[in-house]
C-alpha cells in the first residue's frame, strides 16, 4: 500500500536553473512605492520557524504571528510560511507578506523556484472522505463564510474518494512530530480533479485527524511540548506542492476538546471553534505562485533567492534545506540571524553545521561557539554575514540597521574598533622588494 511520509532529503524536481544577472527591476509585493523609495532596492527578509519541532515561539497556535507582524513593519517584503502565519480561526492580513508553503520555500532558497506575487488565487478545497457529515458541514460553512464575509475566491470543493487515514507520531530520534497518510493517491486525485475541472491554482486540504486523548495534548495546551499535528500536516502539503507546484496548506478536522480553564494563551487559538480553516483560506487567497527559475520567471518580475537580504530562524533549527541553502549561497549571500530565545527539540546549531556566526550578545549563551567568546575581539564583526541574537527584539533591530545600511555593531558600546590595514599579496613572479622599489619610483608611499 502506498504511503506518504516525511524524509530529511526529498527528491528534487528537474527544473531549469539558468542563472541570470540580477540587474532587473525588483517587483513589489505590496503597494506601489512612493517617490522616495525609487532610488533604493526593496529589502526582503525570510522568517523560518520549522513545523512540529516544539519551537518556544512558533511551536503553538500562531504564536509567531506577532513576530511576523513586527518584522513586516520594518522590511519591504517578508517571506514566511503557514506555520508562522496560521492561527486557526485567527489571522492577520499583511499586504507585504508572502505566504509560502515549506517545501516551496526550500526550493526557492535553493534557487530552483521563483515566487510570483499575485492579486488573487482561485482556491479549491479538498475534504477528507473520512470526515463525518456534521464536521464536513461545519467546514463547508467556514468556506461559505469566507466567501461571503471576506470575499475570498474559494471556487469549489471535492471529497476524496477514499478516506486519507492520517497517522501521526513523534520521531524517536529527533523528538519532532511527523506522520503519514495511508492513501496519498486519493489526495492527489482530488487535487488533480479540482485543477482540471475548476482551474484552481491553490488548494486547501482538510484531513480528518485522530481525536487525541486529553492526556496526550495536555502539555501542548499548557504551552510546553510539541504540536503533535504539525509534522504530518507538513507531509500533506509537501506532497501536493511537490506534485503540482501550486500553493497548498492544510487544516486538521477534529472534534473539539473538553473545556479547560487552565489553558496557555499560546495554545488558545485552537480552542475557540470547530475548525482551523479560516487562516488557511485567507493565506492561500493571495499566496505567490511557484515558477521554475528560468528566463520566463525573470521576465515576469518574480522574486528569487538572490533577492533575499536577511533570514531569521531559531538558534538550533538550522539544518533545514532552506536554511542551509541560504547560509551556503555563494552569490548575494543574505544576513543569517539566529534567535537564541527560540529553542526547539532539535540540536542543529550554526557551529555544528559549519555556519559561521557572529555573537551579538553581551551575556553568556550556551549556543555561543568557543571561538566567539568576546564580542569586541570578534574578527568577523567588520563584515557581518551571520549573527546570533538573544531574542526577536534584537533580530528586528539588526534588520532595521541592515536595511538602513548601518553596521549593527555601531549601535553597541565598544562595537566598532579601529580600522585595520589590509596588505596586498605579492604578485606572481615579483618579489616584495621589487614591488617596494616600483612604488618608490612612482612616488606612491
Where does each model-flagged region fall?
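Metallocofactor- and cofactor-centric catalytic cores in central/energy metabolism, strongly enriched
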Residues: 2-205, 211-219, 225-230, 432-443
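Low-complexity, flexible helical/coil segments
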Residues: 79-88, 112-119, 159-164, 238-245, ...
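Acidic, Ser/Thr-rich peripheral helices and adjacent loops at domain boundaries
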Residues: 94-103, 263-284, 353-364, 383
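Conserved beta-strand scaffold positions in the cores of enzyme catalytic domains, especially
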Residues: 154-157, 248, 336, 357
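Residues that form or immediately flank small-molecule/cofactor binding pockets and catalytic motifs
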Residues: 159, 253, 341
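Long alpha-helical, hydrophobic tracts
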Residues: 166-329, 335-337
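C-terminal functional extensions of proteins
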Residues: 256-257, 282-310, 314-445
Amino acid at each position: 500500500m502506498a504511503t506518504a511520509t516525511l524524509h530529511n532529503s526529498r527528491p528534487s524536481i528537474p527544473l531549469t536553473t539558468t542563472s541570470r544577472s540580477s540587474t532587473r527591476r525588483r517587483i513589489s509585493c505590496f503597494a506601489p512605492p512612493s517617490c522616495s523609495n525609487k532610488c533604493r532596492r526593496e529589502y526582503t527578509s525570510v522568517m523560518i520557524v520549522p513545523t512540529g519541532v516544539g519551537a518556544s515561539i512558533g511551536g503553538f497556535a500562531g504564536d509567531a504571528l506577532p513576530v511576523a507582524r513586527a518584522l513586516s513593519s520594518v522590511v519591504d517584503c517578508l517571506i514566511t510560511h503557514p506555520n508562522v502565519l496560521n492561527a486557526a480561526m485567527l489571522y492577520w492580513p499583511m499586504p507585504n507578506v508572502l505566504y509560502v508553503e515549506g517545501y516551496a520555500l526550500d526550493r526557492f532558497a535553493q534557487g530552483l523556484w521563483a515566487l510570483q506575487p499575485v492579486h488573487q488565487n482561485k482556491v479549491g478545497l479538498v475534504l477528507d472522505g473520512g470526515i463525518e457529515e456534521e464536521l464536513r458541514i461545519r467546514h463547508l460553512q467556514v468556506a461559505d463564510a469566507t466567501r461571503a464575509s471576506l470575499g475570498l475566491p474559494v471556487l469549489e470543493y471535492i471529497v476524496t474518494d477514499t478516506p486519507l487515514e492520517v497517522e501521526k507520531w513523534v520521531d524517536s530520534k529527533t523528538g519532532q512530530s511527523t506522520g503519514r497518510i495511508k492513501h496519498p493517491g486519493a489526495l492527489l486525485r482530488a487535487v488533480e480533479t479540482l485543477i482540471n475541472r475548476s482551474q484552481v491554482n491553490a488548494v486547501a486540504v482538510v484531513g480528518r485527524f485522530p481525536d487525541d486523548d486529553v492526556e496526550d495534548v495536555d502539555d501542548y495546551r499548557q504551552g510546553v511540548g510539541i504540536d503533535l499535528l504539525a509534522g504530518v500536516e507538513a507531509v500533506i502539503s509537501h506532497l501536493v506542492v511537490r506534485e503540482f507546484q501550486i500553493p497548498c496548506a492544510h487544516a486538521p478536522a477534529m472534534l473539539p476538546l473538553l473545556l479547560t480553564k487552565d489553558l496557555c494563551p499560546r495554545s488558545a487559538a485552537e480552542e475557540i471553534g470547530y475548525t482551523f480553516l479560516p487562516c488557511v483560506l485567507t493565506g492561500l487567497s493571495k499566496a505567490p505562485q511557484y515558477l521554475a527559475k528560468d528566463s520566463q520567471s525573470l521576465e515576469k518580475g518574480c522574486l528569487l533567492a538572490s533577492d533575499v537580504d536577511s533570514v531569521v530562524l531559531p538558534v538550533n533549527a538550522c539544518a533545514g534545506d532552506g536554511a542551509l541553502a541560504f547560509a551556503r549561497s555563494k552569490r548575494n549571500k543574505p544576513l543569517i540571524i539566529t534567535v537564541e530565545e527560540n529553542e526547539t527539540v532539535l540540536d542543529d546549531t550554526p557551529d555544528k553545521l559549519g555556519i559561521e556566526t557572529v555573537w551579538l550578545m553581551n551575556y553568556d549563551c550556551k549556543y555561543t561557539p568557543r571561538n566567539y567568546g568576546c564580542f569586541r575581539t570578534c574578527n568577523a564583526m567588520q563584515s557581518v554575514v551571520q549573527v546570533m541574537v538573544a531574542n526577536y527584539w534584537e533580530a528586528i533591530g539588526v534588520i532595521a540597521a541592515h536595511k538602513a545600511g548601518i553596521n549593527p555593531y555601531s549601535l553597541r558600546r565598544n562595537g566598532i574598533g579601529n580600522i585595520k590595514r589590509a596588505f596586498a599579496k605579492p604578485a606572481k613572479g615579483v618579489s616584495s622588494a621589487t614591488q617596494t622599489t616600483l612604488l618608490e619610483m612612482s612616488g606612491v608611499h
